[in-house]
Amino acid sequence: MALFVGYILLISRMPDIRRVFMYHGAEHKSVHVWEADEPLDVDHARPKTTAHPRCGTSLILIALATSFVVFAVVLPFVPRVFESDAAHAVFLLVIKLPLLLPIAGLAYELQRMAAKNPDNGLVRALIAPGMLFQRLTTREPGDPELEVALAALRKTVWREQQDSGPVKSDASVEVFPSFAAVDAQLPLAA
């Protein structure tokens, strides 16, 4: 866990990663606006928080904590079948790998439960580390980052409303001369 946190702290000093973290914060603000059923525009997004209970960062933290608990419960009962340390390590890896699926599933369900019951004290305690960890992986975005996140969300909402199936392969990359041109193409533009 300390290695993961240290890695995030280290890369967060890089200017490009700081910008990525600003987009991450903008994504959260956009989702907060959408969940509040407010207009998807910068003025409504700006005051929202950059922390979100269903963040992937929180999910990673929940999955790590869940894996620690599961492995602490399961691995002591695994007999040592090989005398060689290397062979035993491989054997433990073979046992741990299939456990990753239920660990990920349990972490996902814990996060869903947290999102459905955000006012419950136990749930708040469960998600508190993830919410704190988001302080490392999000930064306060500027208006340009908010515009991009809101445009992406508007396009996503529009696509879901259209239920038009898969995106055509020839339309997978579109180039626009400016952000205003992108915004003008979006049906839900503010």
Ranges and model annotations:
Residues 52-57, 85-97:
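Hydrophobic, aromatic-rich alpha-helical transmembrane segments
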Residues 63-93, 104, 108:
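Juxtamembrane "helix exit" motif at the C-terminal ends of alpha-helical transmembrane segments
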Residues 1-12, 67-71, 100-112:
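Alpha-helical transmembrane segments of multi-pass membrane proteins
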Residues 89-97, 101, 105, 109, ...:
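Short amphipathic alpha-helical segments
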Residues 1, 5-59, 113-118, 122-190:
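Polar-ligand-bearing catalytic/cofactor-coordination segments
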